[in-house]
Regions:
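An active-site metal/cofactor-coordinating segment within enzyme catalytic domains
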Residues: 1-38, 44, 91-92, 178-192
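C-terminal active-site rim and adjoining tail of enzyme catalytic domains
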Residues: 20-21, 91-192
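Solvent-exposed polar/charged
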Residues: 31-32, 82, 130, 155
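Short, well-ordered coil/turn segments that N-cap beta-strands
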Residues: 34-39, 63-67, 85-88, 113-115, ...
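Active-site cleft segment of glycoside hydrolase catalytic domains centered on the general acid/base Glu
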Residues: 36-42, 47-67
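Distinct, well-ordered alpha-helical segments
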Residues: 48-59, 75-85, 100-110
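Short beta-strand-to-loop elements that line the ligand-binding cleft
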Residues: 67-70, 142
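Aromatic-lined carbohydrate-recognition surfaces of secreted/lumenal glycan-active proteins
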Residues: 70-73, 86-92
Length: 192
């Protein structure tokens, strides 16, 4: 969504020339940074998935395994698997929205070929992370803005976190590695 609080509208309804310059197209993003990284995108527009996949794979066919598409509708998300067997699909939800319970959701995600579940940091526990891992799912936590939250999510065994603060995430990974008796440089060979 773009615009102020009173006039928000879907980005697909806005001409490219009317978007702020800090909002790149996928092509501009890849032209600027290349494709040698994992990219996670929230599909806020239910029709965006096919275009995102086409643009990403049109730029670099190897991007599929590094493209993580997140949607709050896991049934709709699963239909994207037909477009590429290698893209990563992420059910992005809240624990309170999982009416059938976490174990049944995990089983359904496994059945649909979904790769991960992404919950708000406050929804996670170590037991819940273990449950989803038992079904072969990666576990992600979003809105991890503070050290204590990042540290807690990593201690719970989450596979990934979403934060607005890259240096904090790197520091949290280093602290987690030290706590587990590992050398942080083994996890980050390029250094801080």
């Amino acid at each position: 969504l773009v615009g102020g609080r009173l006039r928000r509208r879907p980005i697909r309804d806005v001409a490219r020339a009317d978007l702020p310059p800090h909002v790149p197209t996928l092509r501009e993003l890849f032209d600027t940074f290349g494709t040698g990284f994992d990219l996670s995108l929230d599909l806020k527009d239910p029709d965006a998935g096919p275009a995102v996949i086409a643009d990403s794979l049109g730029t670099d066919p190897t991007m599929a395994s590094r493209l993580w598409l997140c949607d709050q509708d896991h049934e709709r998300l699963a239909t994207l698997r037909e477009l590429s067997p290698h893209i990563r699909l992420v059910d992005s939800t809240r624990l309170s929205r999982i009416k059938e319970g976490p174990e049944r959701r995990a089983a359904r995600l496994q059945e649909l070929g979904i790769d991960a579940i992404n919950l708000h940091h406050s929804d996670w526990s170590g037991g819940l992370s273990t449950l989803f891992h038992r079904f072969g799912l990666c576990t992600f936590g979003w809105d991890a803005q503070f050290d204590r939250i990042l540290d807690g999510l990593l201690r719970m065994g989450l596979d990934g976190v979403f934060s607005d603060h890259v240096p904090r995430m790197v520091d949290a990974l280093d602290r987690n590695a030290v706590a587990r008796g590992l050398d942080p440089l083994d996890l980050n060979p390029e250094g801080p």
